Amino acid sequence: MSLATLDSMGGASTGSVTVTEQLNFWAGRRVGGRNSEHAEPVFEPATGRVLCQMVPCGAEEVDEAIMSAHAAYVQWSKKSGTERARVMLEAARIIRERREKIAKLEVINNGKSITEALVDIDVAWQCIEYYAGVAGTLAGQHFQLPGGAFAYTRREPLGVCVGIGAWNYPFQIAACKSAPALACGNAMVFKPSPFTPVTAVILAEIYKEAGVPDGLFCVVQGGAETGSLLCNHPKVAKVSFTGSVPTGKKVMEMSAKGVKQVTLELGGKSPLIIFKDCDLENAVKGALMANFLTQGQVCCNGTRVFVHKDILPQFLEEVVKRTKAIAVGDPLLDSTRMGALITKPHLEKVLGFVRQAKKEGGRVLCGGEPFVPSDPKLKGGYFMSPCILDNCRDDMTCVKEEIFGPVMSVLPFDTEEEVIRRANNTTFGLASGVFTRDISRAHRVAASLEAGTCFINNYNISPVEVPFGGYKMSGFGRENGQVTIEYYSQLKTVVVETGDVENYF
């Protein structure tokens, strides 16, 4: 969908859009897939109808994209940080100007509510704007050495970076991976999820309109095979991947063969701990934020909700009431708070977790069933009612495994020491949360939790200035914040002698 077509999105509605434009982008233009016999249908989650066809890129196309990116990198890396910042600020401005139309297209491809999608697009331009500000500040250090000698360091780009995105935040992930890469002087080849191929190419066109060299941000479509070609290409210097743990392991293994730098943002089964001295109203709202954004399809969601036994009845009463009131339906309506899950197989997988929880002794307090909206055009959509599971134990499947859907597992606890031990009893470590009025306890628990992020008296708030990433099997490296510059650049040390060389021999 070209930028010109994007401008016609103002009047688009659910079920009314079909994408026929080419979805790859390199050398400054859209490129069609050459392996049309391998085309895969992409479905609109809210209706179940075919939105477009995704044609995966093969070895020849991947090579063309990477060589295009490398040529652009040679030009871009020679620009000053201020010059790069100027172009990036223009890209942020264009996104901001077209946020509503981009958000609509994101909803049609992804299924989340328009209210959430607008926030996602805002985060995208804010991230590009933030790293534009960082670009002009990149600098090394000076070291005075004995005898008038000195040394200095140069912070240099890596080269061609690969970004592999997930389907829950398609446009935002493309922006948040490319922004620090471009700020440091790199180029990026980005592969979206095959379920959400539509909006990353819009970002590529926006970068081109803003003035980046042709090829600086390329988009290649495809699944696992295309991803493998990217990770194994000798011209690629770094891979940044967002997705599941099993796929992340494969990305790491493939990248290791070429000694490429890797950032992995993987899955989670994050704990949210609610102490009895909390503000219960805020704790309930936090639990909803921790479980039901993007239909529960968020890697850092706090899906293990530990509630002190003394307030468990009050918490359950209020959280069930609020959950039943969540408006599920047409994601393009402003009143909708939960849209459709990404695919029919994924919907069935999530519903299967609920069935398994019941077999293992869990009690469904609300939801956990297929939901059919009243609008006839949504009959084939992938909707379900948000679910609260009570009577959960730490050894249950729904508590141990990442569900990636709108399912909250509630677990009672008694003491602080007990709940910290139970919260850390997982192979994941992406996020965590604490609700308490006791400031000492809040910081004590935050220090004890084995997770890359800990939210205190809130949840799922991730400003672009703040680093985000995991512990343990949730990955390594960071996205967002100043520290991410270190993951998209390398240091060169230059040692200068101003006198004579010592005659050792």
Swiss-Prot record:
For biological process, the GO terms are: aldehyde metabolic process; carnitine biosynthetic process; protein homotetramerization
Q: What class of enzyme is it?
A: oxidoreductase
Expressing tissues:
Constitutively expressed in all organs tested: brain, eye, gill, GI, heart, liver, kidney, muscle, skin, testis and ovary.
InterPro entries referenced in this protein's UniProt entry, alphabetically: Ald_DH/histidinol_DH, Ald_DH_C, Ald_DH_CS_CYS, Ald_DH_CS_GLU, Ald_DH_N, Aldehyde_DH_dom
- Which SUPFAM superfamilies does the record cross-reference, listed alphabetically? ALDH-like
For the ligand (NAD(+)), the binding residues are 191, 243-247, 402
Give the positions the UniProt entry annotates as the active site: 265, 299
Q: Does the keyword NAD apply?
A: yes
Quaternary structure, from the entry = Homotetramer.
Q: Can you name this protein?
A: 4-trimethylaminobutyraldehyde dehydrogenase
Q: Which organism is it from?
A: Oryzias latipes (Japanese rice fish)
Please state the gene responsible for encoding this protein.
aldh9A1
